Amino acid sequence: MVKVESFELDHTKVKAPYVRKAGIKIGPKGDIVSKFDLRFVQPNKELLSDKGMHTLEHFLAGFMREKLDDVIDISPMGCKTGFYLTSFGDINVKDIIEALEYSLSKVLEQEEIPAANELQCGSAKLHSLELAKSHAKQVLENGISDKFYVE
């Protein structure tokens, strides 16, 4: 199997929450695409709830784009410990952290979930505003770092 960047990360030595630049790709026409690991909870110790994570995905899709112009996608990690963000350009981790703090703060102010209906969402019943707010609050209280390895 081809080496996968995320499998090369020593998950026993990271300290969540953090933002990590997971890689940069340069396309055949010179386009730069950056990938970020937005880790909310500690790998192999905690999980984001299915409903809370799905709801956060909906919120982050909008709020992160309010601060970052070149977002391609924000996707939940299969391990349920955070999200991947892909973006055009070589963006600084500090800018991602600032946008994420803004976005999670905005989640705490919300009273309804965007696009949580069968027309716009493939799993419209798999949402919880309460759990999304709880996850957002926990990440903000713990503080988001750009230092991801435990020393």
From Swiss-Prot:
Reactions catalysed according to its record: S-(5-deoxy-D-ribos-5-yl)-L-homocysteine = (S)-4,5-dihydroxypentane-2,3-dione + L-homocysteine
Cysteine pairings via disulfide bonds: none
Record-level GO BP terms: quorum sensing
Protein origin, superkingdom: Bacteria
Subunit structure: Homodimer.
HAMAP family listed in its UniProt record: LuxS
Protein name: S-ribosylhomocysteine lyase
The encoding gene: luxS
